[in-house]
Each structure stands twice: as structure tokens, then as C-alpha cells.
Amino acid sequence: MKSSICCFSGYRPEKMPPDLPEGSAAFDRMLQRLRWSIRRASGAGYRHFLSGMSRGFDLWAAEAVLELQEQGHAIDLWAVVAFPGMEQYWEPEWQRRYHAVLSRAVKKFPVSAKYAPECYTLRDRFLVERSSRCICFFDGVPGGTAYTVRYARRCGLLIDNLAERQLCFDDLNIIE
């Protein structure tokens, strides 16, 4: 089963590079690479996509999975929530997006019953330990994404890093 599961890891909006604000042409290109990576993983047999459901890359990735699912791709979304209510202090638009995505996830995994200092690390480990591939946006900034990508590498996951300037997908090069 693990061979058909892919997780996501990436930054919250405020940690994304300043040249990638949501709605910009550069952001749209990143989303295009994200959708391409999901389609590529689906073509390689991945059917289940795990999102950590945080603002930013996690939710953008979850929305992309749902969009591709609507287009007929045989994939589904699993929501891995650090703790119930983690979205309650977010901006209203992010709360709306979170609930829209959560309502369409076929599986929901609350990792902790309530907030605890280690709940996000536990969530990140849950994502990695159940997956064999990780699609991420990581450009070297320290924090939770750095931890998750390092852990995924140690666990032997295939890594598709959308922050790399040149992504090679078999014989296709996507160059910015």
C-alpha cells in the first residue's frame, strides 16, 4: 500500500519566496509544476495523496489533487490534521479553503487530540512514514519543511522538489 501513497511538504504563504505571491505568474508556474508532479506520480501508480492541511503549499497541493480528481484522474486525497481545530486562528479565506478541502478528503487522520508542542512534528512523521514519495517545495529555509524533507530522504522516499530551478521528468525538462 505504501508504494501507492505520496505526501506533500512545503511552506506556509509567509515563508514562500517573495517572488512567488499567490496569483502571480511565477506562482501559477509553480502550480503548473505541482499538477504535473501529481499527474506524473499518478502515472507511476500513486493513488493516495496525503496533505498536512496547513496554510500554503499543503492546501495548494490538496486543491490540485481535488482538481485533477475532478478531471478524471484515479486519485484521492487523505487529510492529515495535526490536531482538530488547528485552523481556528487562520484568516477567514484560509479557513474556508481548509474546510472545503477537508470535506472532500476520503480519509481524515487527526494525529493529536489537541494542540501539543510536538503535534506538527508528529504529523510530518505520519506523512513520511506512510508514503514512498514526497512532492515538496523546499529551497533551504530552516523549519518544518526542512525537517520533513530531511526525514523523507533518510526514509528513502522519492523526492520531487518544485523549488529546484530545473526539474527533470524523464525526458521532459521544465525550465524557468
Residues of each region from the PLM?
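Acidic/glycine-enriched connector segments
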Residues: M1-I175
